[in-house]
Regions:
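Extracellular, repeat-based ectodomains that mediate carbohydrate processing or recognition
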Residues: 1-134
Length: 134
C-alpha cells in the first residue's frame, strides 16, 4: 500500500510501448478507483522490458525494477530501476542496477528497508559460478 492508502500495480504489455513488451503502472485509491492512466515505466523500448516488481516508499512514491532484454547493459539482459512520486510522475531516468553484465540478469525484486534505502535482488547467470545465483 502507498502512504495515502492507495496502491499501484504493474504489468508487461505487448506493443503498448511501440515495440515488444513494455512495463506499465497504474495508481488506484484505497477504494480501488483508478487515479491515473497507464504510465509507461521503461524509456528504452527495444527488446523486451518485463518481469517488474514494485515497492512503496515512505514519501508516497514508489520504485519499479524490471528486466530489460535489450542488451542495454552491454550483454544479454539487465536489471533497471526507476523512481516515481505519489502521482506516478517519474523522478529519475532508468538506472542500471546490475554491475555484472555478462549473460543474463533477471527476475528482480525490490523492497524498502527501514532506513528508506532500496534493496534490489535478482538472479545472475554464472556470476557466482552457477547458472542462477542470487
Amino acid at each position: 500500500a502507498l502512504a495515502n492508502g492507495g496502491f499501484v500495480v504493474s504489468w508487461s504489455s505487448w506493443a503498448q510501448d511501440g515495440q515488444n513488451y513494455g512495463v506499465f503502472t497504474r495508481l488506484f485509491d484505497s477504494s480501488g478507483n483508478a487515479v491515473s492512466g497507464d504510465v509507461q515505466v521503461n524509456t528504452t523500448t527495444s527488446g523486451y522490458q518485463d518481469h517488474s516488481s514494485i515497492a512503496a516508499m515512505d514519501d508516497g512514491g514508489f520504485a519499479v525494477v524490471w528486466t530489460s532484454d535489450s542488451g542495454q547493459d552491454g550483454d544479454g539482459s539487465g536489471i533497471f530501476l526507476r523512481l516515481f512520486d505519489s502521482s506516478a510522475s517519474a523522478i529519475t531516468a532508468e538506472i542500471q542496477v546490475n554491475s555484472y553484465t555478462t549473460g543474463a540478469q533477471s527476475d528482480a525484486n525490490v523492497t524498502v528497508l527501514d532506513n528508506g534505502n532500496l534493496l534490489v535482488s535478482w538472479t545472475s547467470d554464472n556470476q557466482d559460478g552457477s547458472e542462477g545465483g542470487v
